[in-house]
């Protein structure tokens, strides 16, 4: 959200507003994750600690990269992507993050002529192959179901849970995103949340269908907060937005006001 601020400035703003952690999109640091220098990684750790925060982890993992794709039938591209996940895990570990949110809708969508089963097999192999390294690094990989307007692969939380169960590794879990759950239509967002055990959730994004933060649109967070409490989820609720006007600080302030109102 704070793409135009330095990382240290972002941490300072987040801390002053009452946030407890920050998520990092790798492309905001360098063109590729392996381009983030050791000095940058050290400065990230220092900026986070200086402001009394924690690094939650990484998201938007493949955003603004080229030649990478999770379900591609192209063997060369597939191998590059597998290797790149190892690079991302190293980055997440180095900045002391614990989760990697696998959204990247365009880089996972099935290509023309590819069946769902073929794409599924590719995804299972991709993520299963990364899980042991993630475990060693103390990182949990989180598959993020996304709406059909964004991708044609893994659109529902039920599909995300199915993938999680097939991979069957403690460091691979499902990610919940309010905007994406709203896109499912039915069941309701609270009922989708209730369909998931807290121990199967790796991370949780809060936002609105209008692409702003929680409380800035039509989604009612009262029933969502109740469902979150019912299943016993007591870890991160992380603000993710896609519109930045009037300005990121205002959005961050309004978002945390909503979270405090319903979740405190």
What are these model-derived regions, one by one?
Residues 5-9, 47-51, 67-173, 183:
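Active-site acidic/histidine proton-transfer and metal-coordination neighborhood
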Residues 47, 55-58:
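Conserved alpha-helical segments that form or flank metal/cofactor-binding pockets of metalloenzymes
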Residues 25-48, 104, 111:
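Glycine-rich, proline-tolerant flexible connector loops at the mouths of alpha/beta enzymes
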